[in-house]
């Protein structure tokens, strides 16, 4: 197999998006479009990936990092000019180069590999990825010769009435012999209305030289969708969402309503998990087996253990053990660790805390910056008071402690093993193990007070 290279075009301004955000950084299923393209290419182990950047160059580099190399197109003078900027990285190297658009997030590694393999088998100098469209209006048509090779690509506006009947179109993805590509690019002119250098002109140059130009027609038309506006962005979102959800359903995950469930392409879900509508599984979240998620639940960059239920709640950047019950209306904030068999109930917020096995906070509690042992009970209205307006402090609660209703634990403070905090207490000092701590005003009953007051 030849050396393989990729050039990803990501320098266009994307004015039709009507956005301050650079076009290829708009997200599809939670990930920037250009990131999807890079991920698919990277999966094939290419020798080098060059991303052409221009508008928003720093933002694109920040997103992609060192996974790719970069070439700057300072002036946007067309797709041919853009690819030519990669010459410093790829010029003179033998191999095959595929040119991809950074706004085609649906293109898969499988299709990319098929195009390149077909190109090598055909021993062509160029291969065009094509698709058959029911309505090809606006697309360049593929005109083939009697041998089935590409004779020319005719833009819609230049096509004859007969050529407009052709339904095979150019998708904008090309595979080239690398050396032939850069040699031909230097011959591309800009004698057109826009004064730009167009990559498809390379096809005509190679044909004029008698070189072989092939076409690989994909059956997966939806993969070729280029996103140029918000309508196409929504279409891409729907296609990818369906693709992701169907893949998990085939692996044994139940989606009650796939159209209303959103799963990141980087997420992992275990067998026999059931996901209800309105649930979002975002980022690099890992879900165990036999879980119940939703409805209306958001999980992001978190790990959820087997047989855990998260209902109408939010979990971000945290780890949750097995057989845990969360919700409804709970919020697990970043850097939290919830161990096995814990109950986090309605209207409970946990932030940057560790909660030991079999502990419970069933309702209306805030647990922040805390180390909680095993079998601890937080009664209704329990609060760890962790912030003095400037600094955050630690609350430590040891195994088997019982925190009574409407209690405030003023950090830094330690509640000893098996200690009991009486309801309504405000605790400012450490409580020894097995102690009962009462920190509230003594109740006084004044008999007949109301009668005397009203007379």
From Swiss-Prot:
- In short, the EC number is 2.7.7.23, 2.3.1.157
GO cellular component terms listed in the entry, alphabetical order: cytoplasm; membrane
Residues the record lists as binding UDP-N-acetyl-alpha-D-glucosamine: 9-12, 23, 73, 78-79, 140, 155, 170, 228, 333, 351, 366, 377
Region spans: Linker: 231-251
Keyword Transferase: yes or no? Answer: yes
Q: Where does acetyl-CoA bind?
A: 386-387, 423, 440
The active site of this protein is located at 363
Location of the region described as N-acetyltransferase in the Swiss-Prot/TrEMBL record:
252-455
Instruction: List keywords of the entry alphabetically.
Output: Acyltransferase, Cell shape, Cell wall biogenesis/degradation, Cytoplasm, Magnesium, Metal-binding, Multifunctional enzyme, Nucleotidyltransferase, Peptidoglycan synthesis, Repeat, Transferase
Cofactor comment text: Binds 1 Mg(2+) ion per subunit.
Name the cofactor(s). Answer: Mg(2+)
Q: Which GO terms describe its biological process?
A: cell morphogenesis; cell wall organization; lipid A biosynthetic process; peptidoglycan biosynthetic process; regulation of cell shape; UDP-N-acetylglucosamine biosynthetic process
- The record's region (Pyrophosphorylase) falls at 1-230
Q: Which reactions fall under this protein's catalytic activity?
A: alpha-D-glucosamine 1-phosphate + acetyl-CoA = N-acetyl-alpha-D-glucosamine 1-phosphate + CoA + H(+); N-acetyl-alpha-D-glucosamine 1-phosphate + UTP + H(+) = UDP-N-acetyl-alpha-D-glucosamine + diphosphate
Query: What pathway is this protein a component of?
Result: Nucleotide-sugar biosynthesis; UDP-N-acetyl-alpha-D-glucosamine biosynthesis; N-acetyl-alpha-D-glucosamine 1-phosphate from alpha-D-glucosamine 6-phosphate (route II): step 2/2; Nucleotide-sugar biosynthesis; UDP-N-acetyl-alpha-D-glucosamine biosynthesis; UDP-N-acetyl-alpha-D-glucosamine from N-acetyl-alpha-D-glucosamine 1-phosphate: step 1/1; Bacterial outer membrane biogenesis; LPS lipid A biosynthesis
Q: Its Gene Ontology molecular function terms?
A: glucosamine-1-phosphate N-acetyltransferase activity; magnesium ion binding; UDP-N-acetylglucosamine diphosphorylase activity
Q: Which SUPFAM superfamilies match?
A: Nucleotide-diphospho-sugar transferases, Trimeric LpxA-like enzymes
Which positions does UniProt annotate for Mg(2+) binding?
Answer: 103, 228
Disulphide bridges in this chain?
A: none
Where does this polypeptide localize? Cytoplasm
Q: How does it assemble?
A: Homotrimer.
Q: Which family does it belong to?
A: In the N-terminal section; belongs to the N-acetylglucosamine-1-phosphate uridyltransferase family.
Task: Give a short account of what the protein does.
Answer: Catalyzes the last two sequential reactions in the de novo biosynthetic pathway for UDP-N-acetylglucosamine (UDP-GlcNAc). The C-terminal domain catalyzes the transfer of acetyl group from acetyl coenzyme A to glucosamine-1-phosphate (GlcN-1-P) to produce N-acetylglucosamine-1-phosphate (GlcNAc-1-P), which is converted into UDP-GlcNAc by the transfer of uridine 5-monophosphate (from uridine 5-triphosphate), a reaction catalyzed by the N-terminal domain.
The name under which this protein is listed is: Bifunctional protein GlmU
Species, as recorded: Halalkalibacterium halodurans (strain ATCC BAA-125 / DSM 18197 / FERM 7344 / JCM 9153 / C-125) (Bacillus halodurans)
